């Protein structure tokens, strides 16, 4: 029973983020433990703030300690493993303790300050009320007189296998009246339990045998010893699109459960969760939980509580699911591991890969990365023996990879076709419709038209708060900024600079949908983008409708490009890829290769062969041609040579230090001063490999009235480098510069085994 505790408080800035010592009243001492959520008085006014206990019996900083106001119930206490993750995130991502706490527990499980009924005493209140339901268990024998009814006998028989909730019993035809009657007779006992919610109860358990091909079985056999070993291991499952990686997942999960352990499955986007959940629920039944941001707060809390209470053996979800309170983990799967969505863009700026690696180490689990287009860093580590490499080279069922045609859009325009859909693609879609097959079209631009440009001065109409063009959305008849949400309603028709006429140009998913309707009036067209999937459960509903042949053509952004499996999709078209091909950043080619390979792989996954058309103005581009050939190994050799020459990951770590503020000149000065301080601190450690680039304006210079600059630091991501950044942040804070910019540190994580081999010339 601790008498003093060290507490990390909410809303602390990075430089004041430490443990503050508080005394514990006698009535709270038996409730406080490491990981407890508490309410504390903070600052001169002793205002109530949330906090988490990270040390017990802490040494007092002075004799006059303040007392804790309140302590949350034990059910809100962070588990030892989640506590260690909080410290891990704090050390690795430059976040505050409480930012890390908010990442590992969902909103609904958190508490907030309020006052007691007396209107004075500060107390804790739960963000959401936890729902409960009745649970029944056998408490005695069923009397034979009067003669038991059939329903009573059925209830007793069901409960002979253990406690059941009211919901479960009602699903079996046992009414509450029957149960209450048995409770009155002393046959049953009723208690309140936290309500568990099965979001996919309609999916029937099939539990069919998992039949693998010879190649899949070989992959499973290669991974099995790592799964069965109590030590942590990592592996990369590299398989061509349609090779049946998911079947290998299912077999590994089944063995993991047989070993008495649990499994965690990560997917990069919400749109990919329905198909993965369908496979898992059919195979493993009710004990599958879901964690992603499309769930409402109540659903997410109930799923989280189900996991915490041990009611789930498998958790599937997006990036944040890596923090699920799952214990005794034996297997962590990161599907489509190359996707950038596994990195958080807000504090804490973590990589799900790195957290997964940490949890695998904590649990002695197998971390399995999987992809048809692995990240260059992951494949480099696997090829060099730092992680196990397992390959699947054949499509499931022996189907060939899709045939790919590259169409030169310059020649298309010269021949008199001004449309964004080439004649070759139009003809292929028409033939596909006649064959009663389905088509997927990728166009990675939302909206109707992507910019408004003056015919006279050529000025492009930009968002007043951001340095990006406004996008016309025809369905809403307004211009929207996709970064800050600013609107122009109605859309202007004259240039605000010179008064000339505005010409709307570009081609987004809304316009593609309209053009398809004109070309193929008999076809049913589905649009999948952020606008059409904004409603709750929209991803699941629309994908299910496409699977049921309620649509013939699906056009969408990146969410249609990967992980989807529709047996009647035999044609894929790629539109507007050039904007990504010439994007900034050292990963631009990798991203384009992955996107094209993945979307082309959506076709021809069943008995019918697949065909794909890539439209471009650069038909000789080697990346496009390698993607068309689905030749990852050749692409990797080209990419790794470029990375080595330019000193990019995996040959170094990258740390991007961002600066933002309302006045551009002050942001630029702050970035330059920080760069100077970093150089001064680095001079004290001349053996520390470091290369600083910048400061330079951000790739988008202004977002939401905030100007952005950045320093790019090529480094070895280890404790010494992170300590260097911290000391520089401290020096920067102590200088008390007027109107300093906000500073954000974002480390690009690479496999540590690679980083140790860093050598700067």
PLM features: residue spans?
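Solvent-exposed, membrane-proximal periplasmic/extracellular interface segments of envelope transport
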Residues: 60-75, 696-698, 702-714
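A general secondary-structure signal for short beta-strands and their flanking turns/coil
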Residues: 2-4, 17, 46, 436, ...
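Short secondary-structure junctions
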Residues: 13, 520-523, 678-691, 735-740
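Accessory, non-ATPase domains that flank or precede helicase/AAA+ motor cores in DNA-metabolism machines
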Residues: 1-371, 383-399, 681, 719-761
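A short, contiguous, amphipathic alpha-helix enriched in charged residues
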Residues: 4, 17, 32-34, 424, ...
């Amino acid at each position: 029973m601790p008498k003093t505790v060290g507490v990390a408080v909410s809303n602390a800035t990075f430089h004041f983020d430490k443990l503050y010592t508080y005394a514990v009243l006698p009535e709270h001492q038996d409730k406080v433990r490491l990981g407890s959520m508490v309410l504390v008085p903070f600052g001169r006014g002793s205002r109530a703030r949330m906090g988490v206990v990270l040390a017990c019996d802490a040494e007092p900083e002075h004799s006059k300690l303040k007392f804790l106001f309140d302590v949350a119930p034990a059910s809100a206490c962070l588990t030892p493993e989640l506590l260690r993750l909080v410290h891990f995130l704090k050390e690795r991502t430059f976040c505050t303790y409480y930012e890390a706490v908010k990442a590992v527990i969902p909103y609904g499980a958190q508490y907030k300050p309020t006052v007691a009924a007396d209107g004075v005493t500060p107390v804790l209140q739960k963000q959401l009320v936890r729902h409960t339901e009745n649970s029944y268990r056998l408490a005695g024998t069923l009397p034979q007189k009067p003669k038991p009814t059939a329903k009573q006998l059925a209830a007793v028989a069901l409960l002979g296998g253990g406690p059941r909730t009211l919901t479960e019993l009602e699903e079996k035809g046992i009414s509450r009246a029957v149960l209450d009657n048995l409770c009155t007779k002393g046959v049953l006992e009723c208690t309140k339990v936290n309500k568990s919610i099965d979001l996919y109860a309609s999916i029937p358990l099939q539990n069919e045998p998992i039949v693998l091909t010879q190649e899949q079985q070989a992959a499973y056999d290669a991974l099995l010893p790592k799964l069965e070993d109590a030590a942590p291991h990592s592996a990369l499952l590299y398989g061509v699109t349609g090779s049946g990686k998911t079947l290998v997942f299912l077999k590994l999960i089944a063995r993991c459960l047989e070993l008495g352990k649990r499994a965690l499955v990560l997917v990069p986007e919400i749109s990919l969760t329905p198909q993965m959940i369908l496979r898992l629920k059919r195979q493993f039944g009710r004990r599958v939980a879901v964690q992603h941001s499309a769930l409402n707060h109540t659903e997410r809390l109930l799923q989280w509580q189900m996991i915490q209470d041990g009611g789930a053996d498998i958790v599937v979800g997006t990036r944040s699911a890596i923090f699920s309170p799952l214990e005794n983990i034996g297997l962590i799967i990161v599907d489509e591991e190359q996707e950038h969505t596994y990195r958080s863009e807000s504090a804490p700026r973590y990589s799900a890969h790195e957290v997964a690696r940490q949890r695998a180490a904590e649990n002695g689990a197998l971390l399995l990365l999987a992809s048809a287009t692995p990240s260059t860093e992951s494949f480099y580590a696997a090829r060099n023996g730092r992680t196990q490499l397992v390959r699947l080279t054949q499509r499931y069922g022996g189907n060939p990879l899709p045939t790919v045609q590259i169409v030169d859009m310059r020649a298309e325009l010269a021949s008199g076709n001004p449309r964004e859909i080439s004649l070759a693609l139009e003809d292929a879609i028409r033939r596909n419709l006649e064959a009663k097959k389905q088509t997927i079209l990728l166009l990675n631009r939302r909206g109707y038209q992507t910019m408004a440009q003056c015919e006279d001065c050529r000025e492009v109409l930009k968002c007043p708060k951001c340095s990006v063009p406004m996008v016309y959305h025809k369905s809403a008849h307004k211009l929207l900024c996709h970064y800050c949400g600013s609107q122009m309603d109605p859309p202007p028709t004259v240039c605000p600079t010179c008064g000339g006429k505005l010409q709307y140009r570009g081609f987004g998913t809304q316009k593609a949908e309209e053009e398809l309707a004109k070309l193929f009036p008999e076809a049913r067209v589905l649009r999948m983008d952020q606008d059409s999937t904004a409603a709750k459960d929209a991803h699941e509903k629309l994908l299910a409708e496409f699977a049921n042949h309620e649509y013939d053509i699906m056009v969408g952004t990146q969410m249609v490009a990967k992980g989807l499996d529709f047996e009647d999709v035999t044609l894929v078209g790629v539109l507007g890829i050039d904007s990504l091909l010439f994007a900034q950043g050292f990963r631009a080619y990798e991203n384009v290769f992955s996107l094209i390979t993945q979307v082309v792989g959506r076709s021809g996954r069943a008995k019918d062969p697949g065909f794909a058309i890539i439209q471009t103005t650069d038909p000789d581009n080697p990346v496009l041609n390698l993607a068309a050939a689905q030749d990852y190994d050749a692409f990797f050799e080209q990419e790794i040579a470029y990375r080595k020459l330019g000193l990019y990951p995996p040959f170094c770590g990258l740390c991007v230090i961002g600066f933002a503020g309302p006045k551009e000149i002050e942001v630029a000065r702050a970035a330059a001063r920080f760069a100077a301080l970093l150089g001064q601190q680095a001079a004290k450690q001349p053996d520390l490999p470091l290369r600083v680039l910048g400061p330079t304006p951000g790739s988008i210079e202004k977002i939401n009235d905030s100007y952005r600059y950045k320093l790019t630091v090529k480094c070895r991501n280890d404790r010494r480098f992170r300590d260097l950044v911290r000391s520089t942040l401290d020096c920067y804070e102590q200088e008390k510069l007027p109107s300093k910019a906000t500073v954000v540190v974002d480390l690009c994580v690479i496999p540590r085994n690679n980083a140790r081999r860093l050598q700067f010339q």
